[in-house]
Amino acid sequence: MSRMPSSFDVTERDLDDMTFGERIIYHCKKQPLVPIGCLLTTGAVILAAQNVRLGNKWKAQYYFRWRVGLQAATLVALVAGSFIYGTSGKELKAKEEQLKEKAKMREKLWIQELERREEETEARRKRAELARMKTLENEEEIKNLEKELSDLENKLGKK
């Protein structure tokens, strides 16, 4: 049996339909360098703050410099990712049109599948009705043959 189309076939959810956490995960998967840069920058700030508290100004200065460099690298990754993965308004509208066409095609396929199933069901009903009628005819014929046989036996028994 062929795979049936379903109204639950969803390939990609729209960003508007996602929760806040799902959106964060989606964007982190799309541009993995940005969250890595954020984590490294945060680590550099924490180490710098720890060394400031301990009074080690040389190491604190060292980690603050790392923070600046990591923050710059994160911004470069963010801009580069936006440039690479960014889409214009026309591309978004084209994608929307494709999704609408795909939805219409799915609906059309679903209707065709339902019509095919209906035809199969109707054919099965007709076959079942024909089988019932044939069974009734055969039962009547069997009764007639049994009656004829009993008549013949009675004739033979009388002679």
Curated annotation (Swiss-Prot):
Coiled coil regions, renumbered to chain: 88-159
Mitochondrial matrix face residues:
31-35, 86-88, 157-159
The HIG1 domain, residue ranges: 5-96
Primary site of residence: mitochondrion
Keyword Flavoprotein included in the entry's annotation: no
One GO biological-process annotation of the entry reads: regulation of proton transport
| Keyword Transferase (UniProt) | no
Where in the cell is the protein located?
Mitochondrion membrane
What Gene Ontology cellular component terms go with this record?
Answer: mitochondrial inner membrane; mitochondrion; respiratory chain complex
Instruction: Enumerate the UniProt keywords alphabetically.
Output: Coiled coil, Membrane, Mitochondrion, Transmembrane, Transmembrane helix
Domain of life of the source = Eukaryota
Pfam families assigned: HIG_1_N
Give the bilayer topology.
Multi-pass membrane protein
Residue ranges of the TM segments: 14-30, 36-57, 64-85, 89-106, 134-156
Task: Give ranges for the Mitochondrial intermembrane compartment.
Answer: 1-13, 58-63, 107-133
Task: Share what the entry says about its subunit structure, partners included.
Answer: Associates with a subpopulation of the cytochrome bc1-cytochrome c oxidase supercomplexes. Associates in substoichiometric amounts with complex IV. Interacts with COX3.
- Protein family: Belongs to the AIM31 family.
Q: What else is known?
A: Present with 1210 molecules/cell in log phase SD medium.
Name the job this protein performs.
Assembly factor that plays a role in the assembly of the respiratory chain supercomplexes (SCs) composed of ubiquinol-cytochrome c oxidoreductase (cytochrome b-c1 complex, complex III, CIII) and cytochrome c oxidase (complex IV, CIV). Involved in the recruitment of COX13 and RCF2 into cytochrome c oxidase. May also be required for late-stage assembly of the COX12 and COX13 subunits.
- Recorded protein name is Respiratory supercomplex factor 1, mitochondrial
